[in-house]
A protein has these predicted regions:
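Interfacial helix-loop-helix junctions of multi-pass membrane proteins
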Residues: 37-43, 79-100
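Alpha-helical transmembrane segments that form the membrane-embedded catalytic/substrate-binding core
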Residues: 49-53, 90-109
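Short helix-capping/hinge motifs at transmembrane helix termini and TM-loop junctions
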Residues: 30-31, 62, 87, 113
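Membrane-helix interface segments
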Residues: 11-15, 61-68, 91-92
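Small-polar-interrupted transmembrane alpha-helices in polytopic inner-membrane proteins
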Residues: 17-28, 67-84, 99
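"…centered on the first transmembrane helix and the immediately adjacent amphipathic helix/loop
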Residues: 1-55, 72
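Structural signal for the C-terminal ends of transmembrane alpha-helices
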Residues: 57-62, 107-113
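Short, charged juxtamembrane terminal tails flanking transmembrane helices
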Residues: 114-118
């Protein structure tokens, strides 16, 4: 039997989403020992992380994209607000990168569904 990543993601989207939420939370709230080498490079990390977060849920439930944006945007906002309490700093640009990542993940999932013909 051939392995199809899209089918795997669709089947295990909840577990994948929970693991991504845990990973994002750990990386976002771990205290920094030093600033990133390239200023602003963390925006790419935010974009990719939140695109990855939105993709599985959007692939499984493409009509629920509005709920996905609201839920994960609230999560991202709470993470940014919590960062000053763990020797980090929250930024509006990080939150904007999170939102762009969510949109990217949703668009990629919708494109995947359309290409697959589902």
């Amino acid at each position: 039997m051939k392995f199809y990543p899209i089918n795997f993601i669709s089947k295990y989207w909840r577990a994948i989403s929970i693991m991504l939420l845990l990973g994002i939370t750990l990386f976002s709230l771990a205290p920094l020992t030093e600033l990133p080498e390239a200023p602003g490079s963390d925006k790419t990390h935010h974009l990719v992380a939140y695109a990855a977060l939105a993709y599985p849920a959007s692939l499984r439930r493409p009509t629920g994209w509005k709920s996905i944006i609201i839920l994960f945007a609230l999560y991202g906002g709470l993470i940014e607000m919590a960062q000053p309490y763990v020797n980090r700093y929250g930024e509006w640009l990080d939150f904007a990168a999170n939102l762009l990542g969510l949109l990217l993940g949703i668009l990629l999932a919708l494109g995947t569904k359309k290409a697959k013909g589902a």
